[in-house]
Curated annotation (Swiss-Prot):
Coiled coil: none annotated. It comes from Francisella tularensis subsp. holarctica (strain LVS). Catalyzes the ATP-dependent amination of UTP to CTP with either L-glutamine or ammonia as the source of nitrogen. Regulates intracellular CTP levels through interactions with the four ribonucleotide triphosphates. Keywords: ATP-binding, Glutamine amidotransferase, Ligase, Magnesium, Metal-binding, Nucleotide-binding, Pyrimidine biosynthesis. Mg(2+) binds at D74, E143. This is CTP synthase. It is an enzyme of class 6 (ligase). Homotetramer. GO terms for cellular component: cytosol. Allosterically activated by GTP, when glutamine is the substrate; GTP has no effect on the reaction when ammonia is the substrate. The allosteric effector GTP functions by stabilizing the protein conformation that binds the tetrahedral intermediate(s) formed during glutamine hydrolysis. Inhibited by the product CTP, via allosteric rather than competitive inhibition. CTP binds at S16, D150, I151, E152, K190, T191, K192, P193, T194, Q195, K226. The gene is pyrG.
């Protein structure tokens, strides 16, 4: 971080899930539209080292960066809103901070000192914030996870309080997001929760510079004056976060309120006028959609749609590019069997099986894949979805009835899917794993190059000889079965650069049947979409019209 970089800290109060991530990303979008180089960072107060082994039903999606970090789903928002790509430096947790401090204590780096939250933990938090910001960055927006008042967040709040003192008011800004409940029966907006949230923040030494108030409806100047009086925040530094039809409208709403202009003023930034024409085009495209296409997503985490956040957004973005609204029908794979499968898919235009781990609901997914293959329904499989597509093909086309994955059935005699014991990373380093390796941080993670087969549908879609997509898996197609599968009509249309790992499959006789080992949803954005998803949605549109 250079001596001119400005930092905006975004905190939240009253309740969680107010939209701190979207607000932070929207502010970054606005500043980027003014010609500034902006990066973002998310600090998570949980003690896990990363979210890699956490249940998606508790945490939501694990977003994978290009350099292989397993991170919070908010980093997906960041990449969809701004152009800068996130890395492992853009997200860290309490667990990672403590791990680093304890490792240094064991090495003797603290020279016998008693290790304490202050100064050792807070110093490590400050070090990670500052070292994670590149020298060419004009503004860094740092989102603090959790809610003010949570015991887990206190070391992070103390660290940013100290950074305000060390860097000065001209280089730091505190933006606090709170809830303004609207009581419909009384027809009133209640400001008391916001007052108490700001008071709680002041109690630990942080005075909010800007307030963002989440509310069902717009509030008028009388409410602003009341909030300003009791929170010690200037009235012109209080903004509304109102509900919108799509999160991509949020930057435009903030711009209309003069939010970005106020940030430029408060931080004395040398910025040009905002050019939001590209972002306005995105919103116009979303508003102009006509028609609807229904996609069935068959998974086991469907009770929490945040578990598939990037995938949902990739489908929506592809729909916008094709001029239709994508409606996702979430199907719990545990409920699907041979007797009822048709009832789940009779009204859908396409079927998708996403990534996942563990054996729960696997047979329902395989039955769904078989139904898509036999009934010429466009199908997309991702990660585990590709592995199960290979298993289904081996069972029902090759006749290997006990074909399975060694992850899901360790004693299977026909492991068409097996553990990757060795692979080469993009930087040339060789990774090795065994069945006894730790689960956390031991997968094939991050961006890897995939070489596409000439004449394949995948090659036609991507319009390239090779493509880089992000991975998160430890199992792959067993190379001992590849030749037999190809002889039976399955095409491996994408392979790793060393030709050892199967990355893409397709069935040429099918209307549209593609599955990939990677997670292409992580690189889809509302500006640019993603070619694979756009082709898939186009196939779904054509299928629904027939």
């Amino acid at each position: 971080m250079n001596s001119n970089t400005k930092i905006i800290f975004v905190t939240g109060g009253v309740v969680s899930s107010l939209g701190k991530g979207v607000t932070a990303a929207s502010l970054a979008t606005l500043l980027e539209s003014r010609g500034l180089n902006v990066t973002m960072m998310k600090l998570d107060p949980y003690i896990n080292v990363d979210p890699g082994t956490m249940s998606p039903l508790q945490h939501g999606e694990v977003f994978v960066t290009e350099d292989g970090a397993e991170t919070d789903l908010d980093l997906g928002h960041y990449e969809r809103f701004i152009r800068n790509k996130m890395t492992q430096a853009n997200n860290f947790t309490t667990g990672k901070v403590y791990q680093s401090v304890l490792r240094r204590e064991r090495k003797g780096d603290y020279l016998g000192a008693t290790i304490q939250v202050i100064p050792h933990i807070t110093d490590e938090i400050k070090r990670r914030i500052c070292s994670g910001i590149a020298d060419d960055v004009d503004v860094a927006i740092v989102e603090i996870g959790g809610t003010v008042g949570d015991i887990e967040s206190q070391p992070f709040l103390e660290a940013i309080r100290q950074l305000r003192i060390e860097l000065g008011r001209n280089r730091t800004l505190f933006v606090h997001l709170t809830l303004l409940p609207y009581i419909k029966v009384a027809g009133e907006i209640k400001t008391k929760p916001t007052q108490h949230s700001v008071k709680e923040l002041r109690g630990i030494g942080i005075q909010a510079d800007v307030l963002v108030c989440r509310c069902e409806k717009k509030f008028d100047d009388s409410e602003k004056r009341k909030i300003a009086l009791f929170t010690n925040v200037d009235q012109d530094c209080i903004f509304t976060a109102e509900d919108v039809d799509t999160i991509y409208e949020v930057p435009l709403k903030y711009n209309q309120q003069g939010f970005d202009a106020k940030l430029v003023e408060l931080l004395n930034l040398n910025a040009k006028e905002a050019d939001l024409s590209e972002w306005q085009n995105v919103v116009n495209t979303i508003r102009d959609v006509k028609g609807e296409v229904i996609i069935a997503m068959v998974g086991k985490y469907v009770s929490l749609t945040e578990a598939y956040k990037s995938l949902n957004e990739a489908l929506y973005n592809a729909g916008y590019k094709k001029g239709v609204k994508v409606k996702i029908k979430f199907v719990d794979s545990e409920d699907v069997n041979e007797n009822n499968v048709e009832s789940y898919f009779k009204d859908v235009a396409a079927i998708l099986v996403p990534g996942g781990f563990g054996s729960r609901g696997v047979e329902g997914k395989i039955i769904s894949i078989k139904y898509a293959r036999e009934n010429q329904i466009p199908f997309l499989g991702i990660c585990l979805g590709m592995q199960l597509a290979v298993i289904e093909y081996a069972r029902n086309i090759l006749g290997i009835k006990d074909a399975h994955s060694s992850e899901l059935e360790p004693t299977t005699a026909n492991p068409v899917i097996g553990l990757i014991t060795e692979w080469q990373a993009e930087d040339g380093t060789v990774h090795q794993r065994t069945h006894s390796s730790d689960l956390g941080g031991t997968m094939r993670l991050g961006g890897y190059k995939c070489v596409l087969k000439q004449g394949s549908r995948a090659r036609e879609i991507y319009q390239a000889d090779e493509v880089v997509e992000r991975h998160r898996h430890r199992y792959e197609v067993n190379s001992n079965y590849v030749e037999r599968l190809e002889e039976a009509g399955l095409i491996f249309s994408g392979r790793s650069e060393d030709n050892k790992l199967m990355e893409l499959i397709e069935i040429p006789q099918h209307k549209w049947f593609i599955a990939c080992q990677a997670h292409p949803e992580f690189t889809s954005t509302p500006r640019y979409g993603h070619k694979l998803f756009e082709s898939y949605i186009q196939a779904a549109i054509e299928n629904s019209n027939n």
